[in-house]
Each structure stands twice: as structure tokens, then as C-alpha cells.
Amino acid sequence: REQFAEEFGVSRQTVLKWENGTSYPELSKLIDISRRFDISLDSLILDRNMRMIEEFKGNYGKKTISPNYSNMHFWESYSSAIIDEYRQSVDEGLDIEEYKDIFFDISKLPQGAIKKKFGDVIFEIITEAKKRENYKYNEPSTLEEIKALSKPYNIGKKIDTDRLESKINGAWVGRVCGCMLGKSVEGIHTDELIPLLKNSGNYPMHRYILKSDIDAVDASKFKYDLINRPYADTIDGMPPDDDTNYTLLAQQIIDDYGFDFTPLNVLEAWVKYQPKEAYCTAERVAFCNFIKGYEPPCSAIYKNPYREWIGAQIRTDYYGYINPGNPEAAADMAWRDASISHIKNGIYGAMFVAAALSTAAISDNIEDIILSGLAHVPHTSRFYEDVMQVVNGYKNGISCKECFENIHEKYDEYTGYGWCHTNPNAMITVASLLYGEGNYGKSIC
């Protein structure tokens, strides 16, 4: 401070006042300062942020300020998921085959500004791409168009008020118990899961995985981290999980905004009640897009390679709970929630689950529940076709083993897309219900 005061012929106290904002330099002094430190006079007078940028230029010799891409989470970097984007776009029917090699070449680049720029170009290509002429599916994302392509299915039953509370309680407890069954090994692949289960006498699976099961194997031989996981014999209550968090968040949305909440209300609640780290894949992208100013439906579309992944399908249970026997109302709410982060089949999965749960409140017939859920998604969609493949296979006598083999053949669990896409997860859910034949334990295992 003394050196600065001497440099510009003022007192130390004057410099202190300039720093704390109680007084400001005369114009002649500002001109001297701008010349001495190579900072524009405009930036000194008008814009502190501009001054900071120019100081960076002077001090570090940089023409621009760039992020440290190594600090950027995978889900927040569009170019990091460029192969997922390719698979997603192809399945959507976009005519991008001529760019295939470019997608794969970009995926091999290290994280950085160059890869980001290539990703920006890819997004432009995707946005402007046309549908392939032979693409057989019609998959809208607006509620009106979805309804126009849905096939009605009315089971003709009324609410049994004596059983309703038990039904809804069972739905929530069942969700929690099923979630805990999988949480111990969430993310493990079958090539490691099956040997683990066999080693503990739990194959075919018929009970929870215990810490004692893990202690009996050499965990270091597994790629999957078996050590730092919750197990049924080491917990006191259900650990937090995004699957169940979203059910509570949906309840909060209804409490705050009522039954007529909007897609924008959902995003407002997301920002208000949970930090960014609580959201994954499509939800993380939508959250970040909203913070940047993108509102629904753009929040679901802009640089979102996860737009048909399972996130929306796990969020909409609550809308089924609060609309017992009214699957259309449940599906409508699910659409409002899902459309902030997903399109097409990603939305359909959410509507299917909400409608099916609404029907489950008044029926015990598994097939009726499934078909009622399907009545609220386009019959011209991949989702409808995939789920009906499971339903028809079951009715035609295909074994449970063959059913799951067919799902694995169509969707590769060893890719992020195959693992997390809405459709295979819906197929697995439907198969588990059908082949479980009303036995809850058999279905979740």
C-alpha cells in the first residue's frame, strides 16, 4: 500500500479509502493507474469484472479464461458422453450414420477445450439431423400428442376404501425394501454378481446380501467395490437413495404447488430442496441447464445425451399413490415431472409407472396393471414394443430365463446406455412382475 501511494503521489490513508470504497481516485489518477498496470480506463470506472479479466491478461499472459476440464464431472460434460449420444440418436431414428466415425474419434480425445468444441459441433449436427426414411416409430414428447397415440384400457374397477391405505403403505414399503435389496450391489454386472451369489448360497437370489457374505469372499478379486457398501445386517434403517428421495421430493412438490403444479415448478423445487450432487445423468444435465436459464422443455433437450435414461421412470411413484384408480391423472402428473429432463421413451417410462401404480391401488391382476400403464404411452413407440415383447413372451410360454436373456441380448449391460436406458429397465420390471406371479419376494429377487 505504501509503495502504491508513493507511486501515484498520494497518502497511504487515501489508498485505504480507495480500497474500502469511501472515496474514489480523481480522473487523472485513474488515467495514471490504467497506464501503469495496462488496464483500460473503462474497466476501472465501469466494470470490476472486466478489470479482473484484464488483470489476468496482464499478470498471466492469457487471452481467455478457461475452466479446468479435469474438475468437470462426467455428467456435466456433453462431449464426455458422445458415444451415448450416438447410440441415443441412432435409436431415435436420426440420420447420422455418415458421422459415426467422427463420434468415436471425438470420444478418444482427452478432456479439454478442443473436445468441448467438437462436442458443440456434434450437438448442432444432432439438432439439425433429419429422421431416417425407414424409421418405423412415432414418438412425440408433448402430452397432447402422446394421448393421441395411446390405446385406452379400462379395467372397470372401483376403489376399495377398506384396502386403500394398506395398498399405498405396501407400495411405499415395497419400494424401500426392493431398493435396499439392490443398493448393496448397485452398479455390479452379472459376471461378478452371479459368482458372488453362488458363493454365499444365495443363487437363485432369495434373500438380502449380507456383510457376512462379503467377508467370506476375497473382495480384492472383484472389480466392483464390495467393501464400502450398505448391507442388510449393518444398517439401522434405509440409507438415502435417489430412488426414494424422488418420492419424497414429489410429495414436497404437491405440498408447495398443489395438484396443478407445472414443469417449471418441479425444477424450482429441485433447486430449492436438493444440491446439484443429488442429481445424476439426465437430472444433473436438466438441473445445470435450468441454472443457466434453460426452462422446460429446453432443459431436457439441450446437450442431454441421457434424455431417455431411467431417471424419470424412478421419480413418479408418488403420482400413482395420490391418484388411486385414476391412471390418467397420475400419468399427466408424471409427464409434468418427466418433461423437464427427458423426452420420448424417457417420458413414457415415467407415465407408465405412475399409471400402473394408480391401477395397482384398485386391482391385484398383474396383467391389468401393466396394460393399464401401457395405455398411457404411444403404441407407436419403442417403449410400447419392448414392454409388449415381454408381455407376449410370457403369455406364449417363454421361460423367465429366456425372457431375461432376450433383454440382455437387445440391451448391453456393459454399456452405460444399455444399463441405464428406460426401456430395458421397464422390461425387467414387467418381467419380474409377471414371472413373480404376485409373490413380492420372488419379483424383487
Where are these regions (language model features)?
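Short alpha-helical DNA-recognition segment
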Residues: 1-17
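Short coil turns linking two alpha-helices in DNA-binding domains
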Residues: 11-14, 26, 40
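DNA major-groove recognition helix of helix-turn-helix/homeodomain DNA-binding modules
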Residues: 28-43
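Short, charged recognition helix plus adjacent turn
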Residues: 47-59, 63
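Long, charge-dense tracts
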Residues: 60-136
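Accessory "access/gating" subregions that flank catalytic or transport cores
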Residues: 149-161, 284-310, 316-346, 350-445
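Active-site-surrounding "flap" and adjacent substrate/cofactor-binding loops of secreted or lumenal enzymes
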Residues: 187-224
